[in-house]
A protein has these predicted regions:
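Conserved class I S-adenosyl-L-methionine
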Residues: 4-64, 67-75, 78-82
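C-terminal lobe and adjacent flexible extensions of AdoMet/dcAdoMet transferase-like proteins
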Residues: 237-243
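C-terminal alpha-helical "lid/dimerization" subdomain adjacent to the S-adenosyl-L-methionine
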Residues: 167-220, 225-236
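A short glycine-rich, Lys/Arg-flanked "PGG" loop and its adjoining helix->strand segment in the class I
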Residues: 148-160
Length: 243
């Protein structure tokens, strides 16, 4: 029988990497989270992401004063509701492929009149072209089977001059103890302790961003009009639809 002591650090790292890869592949098979998982997700992962999403909401309302914001994969609705509360002049719509998530989100947003939540697929958005001022997505693209299709839909629905801000996990930002300590101080204990694990499962490696995500973007109308850079706990991809 194998014991923990039989594995050296390198072997443990290989085991962890293999398990992480397996979990990520399992997560990508269902693009939506079924009902029991939706409730658990709303109570756990969103707790880790709460403070980082507050910052994103602040950045959005600073960028867009009036107009329509689309939250792709809005989940339990924290980010959408936070944006709507911060800026009553905005109309916010969250869309999610899980039927349970919009129900959870509507309960969270009760009393907030400028936000709505709908069931739908980010690869086939139920919105007219040139109708969205800014699209945002946090921690969703690692679930997406075809990022290119979602990027193309973002381009279609964005108004000329509009942007899409895509955030997803990037475990490299938690690589050193100093990085984990700094982010923990900035965003709370849970981010410092669990951020690396959450990002490894709910995100992409640097290599995957360069091959899978950049490769998909280069096949869309966003080619030459996007930026990809680490931002706090995330990798942030900024997409621009030129005027």
């Amino acid at each position: 029988m194998l014991r923990w002591a039989d594995f050296d650090d390198i072997q443990w790292e290989e085991v962890v990497m293999s398990l992480t890869k397996l979990i990520k592949e399992l997560l990508r098979k269902p693009e939506s989270i079924p009902a029991p998982g939706a409730i658990i997700y709303g109570a756990t992962v969103t707790r880790v992401l709460r403070k980082p999403e507050v910052k994103i909401a602040s950045d959005i309302v600073e960028k867009v004063k009036n107009g329509t914001i689309l939250d792709l994969g809005s989940g339990p609705g924290f980010l959408s509701t936070e944006i709507a509360r911060k800026s009553p002049g905005l109309q916010v719509c969250g869309i999610d492929l899980s039927r349970q998530m919009p129900r959870i989100a509507r309960r969270r947003a009760r009393g907030v009149g400028n936000v709505q939540f709908v069931f739908g697929n980010a690869a086939r958005l139920p919105f007219k072209g040139n109708s969205i001022d800014l699209a945002v997505s946090t921690g969703v693209f690692h679930h997406v089977k075809s990022p290119r299709l979602v990027f193309e839909e973002c381009y279609r629905v964005l108004k000329a001059g509009g942007e899409a801000w895509i955030y997803d996990g990037y475990p490299e930002v938690f690589r050193s103890p100093a990085d984990r300590k700094k982010l923990g101080q900035q965003y709370g204990f849970l981010v410092g302790r669990l951020g690396s694990t959450v990002s490894a499962i709910h995100g992409f490696t640097g290599e995957e961003y360069e091959t899978d995500i950049r490769g998909a973007l280069e096949q869309t109308a966003f080619k030459g009009h996007y930026e990809m850079a680490s931002s706090d706990i995330w990798m942030k991809i900024t997409l621009r639809k030129l005027p």
